[in-house]
A protein has these predicted regions:
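NTP-dependent small-molecule kinase module
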Residues: 9, 33-38, 58, 62, ...
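ATP-dependent small-molecule kinase phosphotransfer cores
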Residues: 70-118, 122-127
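Short, positively charged and aromatic/hydrophobic N-terminal segments
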Residues: 9-11, 15-24
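P-loop (Walker A) phosphate-binding loop of NTP-binding proteins
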Residues: 47
Length: 203
């Protein structure tokens, strides 16, 4: 039996299914990527600090899409902040909650900014790839390091003893694995990134 939880987010009706609380481009490696055309949504993935929410808001406005921040959806559904969920449930417990909610997202014509740890949920990523074009906002480690402040306050899912560098090295291959498009973002302004992505969407 499918369970649907409906609520309004940012004036948009979002449906969460089965959630219970408890034009082609290539990367530098030559990997073929799918076009944004024909996709219902655009899904942004990447490290914390990569600019997913910032780029997402501007890109949504440019395309006439709605904007959805999956971290805020998680907080809306659980009534708790991300760092509170990590403290209460541990990293693994938080990742399970995140995966369940992201795997049930159901919306159209939206730019979805995801949490940096979304790629640990295989079920969620398969679903997001089905409902949208997944775009990896790729930044070098130095750029990420310069941008980030207190990781704990940001609700970053760090395991005991894990450093930001460890996290970066662990996650980057997963971002590459799930992305339809890899968008290089080093030394680029938000408007430049948005222009490049919008050009792909309208190609």
């Amino acid at each position: 039996m499918e369970v649907y939880v409906c609520f309004c987010y940012n004036k948009m009706r979002v449906t969460i299914k089965n959630y219970e609380k408890s034009n082609t481009i290539k990367t530098r490696e030559g990997k073929n990527m799918e076009t944004m055309q024909g996709k219902k949504n655009i899904v942004l993935i990447g490290m914390p600090g990569a600019g997913k929410s910032t780029v997402g808001v501007v890109l949504a406005k440019r395309l006439g899409y709605r904007f959805l921040d999956s971290d805020l959806v998680i907080q809306e559904q659980t009534k708790k902040l991300l760092h509170e969920l990590i403290t209460e449930h541990g990293v693994d417990g938080f990742l399970k909650i995140e995966e369940d909610i992201n795997a049930g997202l159901d919306c159209e014509q939206a730019v979805i900014a995801t949490g940096g740890s979304v790629i640990y949920g295989e079920k969620a990523m398969e679903h997001l790839r089905e409902i949208g074009c997944v775009v990896y906002l790729k930044l070098s480690y130095k750029e990420i390091e310069d941008r980030l402040g207190d990781l704990t306050a940001r609700g970053v899912a760090l395991k005991n003893g894990q450093t930001l560098k460890d996290l970066y090295n662990e996650r980057c291959p997963l971002y590459e694995k799930y992305a339809h498009i890899v968008q290089e973002c080093d030394h680029k302004r938000v408007r430049e990134i948005v222009h490049e992505l919008a050009s792909q969407a309208n190609a």
